[in-house]
Design a protein with these regions (language model features):
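Residue-level signal for the short linker/turn that defines the boundary of a DNA-recognition helix
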Residues: 10, 20-21, 47-50
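DNA major-groove recognition helix of helix-turn-helix/homeodomain DNA-binding modules
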Residues: 50-65
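Alpha-helical residues within the helix-turn-helix
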Residues: 17, 28, 57
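Short alpha-helical DNA-recognition segment
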Residues: 20-38
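Short, charged recognition helix plus adjacent turn
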Residues: 1-2, 67-70
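A short, Lys/Arg-rich alpha-helix, primarily the initiator
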Residues: 1-18
Length: 70
């Protein structure tokens, strides 16, 4: 039996650049550090459900447009 693990992925960078927001601007909008935004974009950190929803609102995206499992 294969040991498959689902990975939580995101399209945060694409959505952010589509809006022409820098990491710093988005971070300020949602109340986190620029490093947190960078870590989420690179998959080093998974946002809490609350932060994920705040990011969706800030970027005018549905949850499933920003976050998915692979």
């Amino acid at each position: 039996m294969k040991n498959d693990k689902l990975r939580f992925k995101n399209r945060l960078k694409e959505a952010r650049t589509e809006k022409k927001f820098s990491q710093s601007v988005l971070a300020e909008m949602v109340g986190v550090s620029r490093n947190t935004i960078s870590s989420i974009e690179t998959g080093q950190f998974n946002p809490t459900a609350k932060l994920a929803l705040i990011l969706c609102i800030a970027l005018d995206k549905k949850f499933e447009e920003l976050f998915y499992f692979e």
